[in-house]
Each structure stands twice: as C-alpha cells, then as structure tokens.
Design a protein with these regions (language model features):
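Basic- and aromatic-lined ligand-binding clefts that recognize polyanionic substrates
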Residues: 72, 76-81, 191-252
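Structured C-terminal subdomain patch of bacterial secreted/periplasmic proteins
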Residues: 274-350
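Bacterial lipoprotein signal-peptidase II cleavage site
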Residues: 30-41
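A short, structured surface patch at a secondary-structure boundary
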Residues: 78-130
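Extracytoplasmic ligand-binding site segments that recognize negatively charged/polar headgroups
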Residues: 96-102, 148-151, 167-180, 214-241, ...
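Proline-aspartate-enriched helix->loop->beta-strand connector
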Residues: 137-143, 161, 276-277
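N-terminal secretory signal peptides
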Residues: 1-10, 14-28
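Extracytoplasmic substrate-binding proteins
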Residues: 60, 151-225, 323-350
Length: 350
C-alpha cells in the first residue's frame, strides 16, 4: 500500500464501465444551463487565455474556456483553487483527517469564510464514484496529485475534460500542482504568486529558527513488522520540512526508490542506515499501530527513536495537513508543527 492511501480511505462504490460513463453523458448533459449560484469562480481569466492545452501522464486535455464547475480528485487541487478565488463544486471525501462530514477542516473554513456552499463529496481512490461526479455536471476535473488510473481517466473524459498528474501517480511536486491548476484556469501568473507567497511564508519561519539549519532528518513510515518506508527528498512531506531549514539526511539519497515513486522500502534489519539522522519524522494510523511499531527492537534501536527526537503527531487532521504543501494547509498547520520540531530538536542537544 502506498503511504498516501491513508489520505483516501473508506469503502467505495464500484466503478462504472466506460459505456456507463457515456450513458451518463446523455442523461446529465454536462452543457446544460445552471443557475448563477452554481458558479465556482470569483475571478475569471480573459477570453484570450483559452484554449489551454495541458499534457499529462494519461493524455492531453484541451480546456476551451474558463471553467465554471470544477471537480477535484486527490489532494491539493482544492486548496490551490481556493487560493485563486475558485471554489469547486465537488471534491473527494476523506475518512482520515476530515471532520464528521468528510470535509478537511481548512477547506471547510475557507468555504464558510467566503460564504460559499460546501462542495459535494464523492468516493475516491480505487472505487472512484464516476456516477456521482457526472451528476455534478462539471466542466473540468482536476486530479494533478492523485492515484487516478487510466481506466478511471477514460471514464471521466467520456463526459468532461480531465487533467491528471504530470508523470506518475502521487509524485507531482507541490509547486508543479499549483502551476497546473493555474494553467487550467488560464491564470498562470496567479499560480506564480501563490507559489512565491508560500515560499516566503516558509522561508520566514525558517529564519525565525536558525538553529534548525544544522539538524538532519529522515521521514519514515511503517506498516507493520519487518519493513521501514523512507520518503525521498521530492516527496511533499520531506520537501515541507526541508523548506523550513532542516537538512535531509544524506543517506536517503543512497536508498533506491520504488519504480515511479518518491518513497522506498527497506528491511528493518537495515534501520541502522538512519543512525545519523538527528530527527525522525513519522506518523501512525492509530495507537495500536504505534504500539506495534515502536515495540520492534530494531525500530527502537534507531538513535533518534531511542532519544525521542521524533516528530510523530497523532492528530489525523495535523498528520494530513503536513503531508502536503499548499496555501491552505501550511498556515493552518505551521504553528503546531514548529512547536513539535522545537521539542524534538531540544532532545538532540540535551
């Protein structure tokens, strides 16, 4: 299981066949009139910005005019849209890190602050609810950081232009995702500003904690007995911590990643590779999993684990927030994250 699956969760409804998707097109009529209350956009691009063509891993998508009813799949696209004044009509639901209704807290706060109706929710992941998406009558589907399959993409493009990830599932960089979203809106310069502002926020935080700069770290996860997962420097969790001024343990670059991914699995017998990491960042799905993992002798022998210079939040909302870099999750999570890092760094120097 890829570690980002913890974001996706819940039992899902079965996929429609491609033929079913075509029949949905006839039933829902994506081009039908909608009332003005259905518009997702507070700021639109000029007509001269279109058409826009976006090439991605699953195909090439042409967006003929400024989209008004956008649906998002995966993570990060919703937040990127909101940062540019655009509110999607439908988003993938979350069981881990979301509130009781399935909304991520920072997204709910943004919709409510803007006086916008909350978006419709639908099942994602392997059981992507194509029918529910079609019923929303979208004119654009954005999935730039997702696990969308070719089959799912073909089903969606039967009734709506769909943008997938650049190269492979769950590997789009945080700034690459923002640029893809901005391009789809016909507003690339707005995306550049969002990226610039976000970099400044993180750089300012790093400047306030100069003692972090000499601190090395590894970002790991475990799924049970015998294995250890290590996130690569390009993975968004790791990139976030690096942008705060900490240094990825050089050993991470020597560990071969799984094909087409930004993470690697090693045997716990090789856990001593992390002996020079000052800090360990990780997460646990629940208390039982944490107990199982930390009770393993090889795991607990990692120096950072032994001295407890570990950043391992247990709040699902915080864990989800710091698993990505975007203009909503960063300000929402940064105060709590910086406190946790300070506590862990103090244990290195004790």
């Amino acid at each position: 299981m890829y570690p980002s699956d913890l974001r996706l969760s819940m039992p899902r409804r079965g996929l429609l066949t491609l033929a079913g998707a075509f029949s949905l097109l006839a039933v829902t009529g994506c081009g039908s009139d909608r009332s003005s209350t259905g518009s997702t956009t507070t700021e639109t691009a000029s007509a001269g910005s279109f058409p826009v063509v976006i090439r991605h891993a699953l195909g090439s998508t042409t967006i003929k005019q400024a989209p008004q009813r956008i649906v998002t799949i995966g993570q990060g696209a919703t937040e990127a849209l909101i940062s540019m004044g655009v509110y999607p009509v439908g988003v993938e639901t979350y069981a881990w890190g979301a509130d009781k209704d399935g909304h991520l807290p920072w997204n709910r706060e943004a919709f409510e602050k803007a006086g916008r109706p909350l978006p419709a929710l639908f099942a994602g992941g392997e059981q992507l609810d194509v029918e529910a998406i079609a019923e929303l009558e979208p004119d654009l589907i954005l999935a730039p950081w997702s696990g969308l399959t070719q089959k799912q993409y073909d089903q969606l493009t039967a009734f709506c232009p769909t943008v997938a990830y650049e190269k492979s599932a769950w590997t789009t960089t945080w700034d690459g995702e923002i640029r893809m979203v901005a391009k789809a809106l016909g507003r690339p310069s707005d995306g550049d500003k969002v990226i610039s502002d976000l970099k400044k926020t993180l750089a300012d935080t790093a400047a306030q904690h100069p003692h972090w700069e000499a601190t090395t770290f590894s970002y790991i996860y475990t799924e049970g007995q015998g294995t250890l997962g290590i996130f690569r420097p390009t993975e968004q969790r790791v990139a976030l911590i690096s942008m705060l001024g900490l240094t990825v343990d050089p050993i991470v670059d020597t560990i071969t990643a799984n094909d087409g991914s930004d993470w690697a699995l090693i045997s716990l017998e090789n856990a001593d590779k992390l002996k020079d990491s000052d800090l360990i960042f990780t997460f646990h799905l629940d208390a039982a999993t944490k107990k199982q993992v930390t009770s393993q002798k090889l795991y607990s022998s990692i120096p950072a684990i032994k001295r407890d210079s570990v950043v391992a939040p247990t709040d699902p909302q915080l864990v989800t927030a710091i698993s990505m870099i975007n203009p909503l999750t960063v300000p929402w999570s940064l105060p709590r994250l910086t406190d946790l890092i300070d506590q862990a760094v103090a244990k290195v120097t004790d």
